């Protein structure tokens, strides 16, 4: 017998041994700066908070195709891009998905910064990184976006030294 419970499969074999296999949703977030050092954020439709553009990988996608799809869906971006994976979140349980999630953060360099709200984006803007901490939110997405910025700055300063 197998059932999905709290983000993992619970399986009981024929002799009564129970096994827990955790399911993970892989999510990608794009850290994109403009020339003024501001960060691109999106407020998705039916959400009340600002976050980095990105989302869950679909089956059979690699990082680049997933990033391109998410950037198109949320901020209307269709061009080429370069990216560097630089951090991963701790595992977190997402109740609405009944799944555990690990989020990978990617620094993205785009061909241009002509962004418009995509089909899943309600509003977009560039924001000073410190202002992310002032955003009122029922979730910690703005704080996680700021933490990603700080991590990138830390890594980038080590590379420059």
Model regions: which residues?
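Nudix hydrolase/Nudix homology domain
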Residues: 48-49, 119-161
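Conserved Nudix-box catalytic region and its N-terminal flanking loop in Nudix hydrolases
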Residues: 34-74
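Short helix-loop capping/hinge motifs at secondary-structure junctions, enriched
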Residues: 38-39, 111-115
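A short coil-to-beta-strand element that immediately follows conserved catalytic motifs
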Residues: 78-87
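Active-site-adjacent beta-strand/loop module that shapes the phosphate/pyrophosphate-binding cleft
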Residues: 90-113, 125
């Amino acid at each position: 017998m197998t059932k999905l419970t709290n983000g993992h499969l619970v399986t009981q074999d024929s002799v009564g041994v129970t096994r827990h296999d955790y399911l993970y949703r892989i999510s990608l977030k794009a850290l994109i700066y403009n020339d003024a050092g501001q960060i691109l954020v999106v407020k998705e439709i039916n959400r009340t908070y600002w976050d980095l553009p990105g989302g869950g990988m679909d089956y059979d996608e690699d990082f680049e195709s997933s990033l391109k799809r998410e950037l198109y869906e949320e901020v209307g971006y269709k061009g080429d891009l370069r990216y560097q994976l630089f951090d991963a979140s701790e595992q977190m349980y997402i109740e609405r998905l009944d799944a555990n999630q690990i989020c990978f953060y990617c620094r993205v360099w785009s061909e241009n910064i002509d962004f418009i709200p995509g089909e899943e984006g309600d509003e977009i803007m560039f924001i000073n990184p410190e202002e992310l901490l002032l955003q009122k939110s029922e979730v910690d997405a703005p704080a996680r976006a700021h933490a990603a910025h700080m991590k990138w700055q830390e890594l980038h300063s080590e590379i420059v030294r």
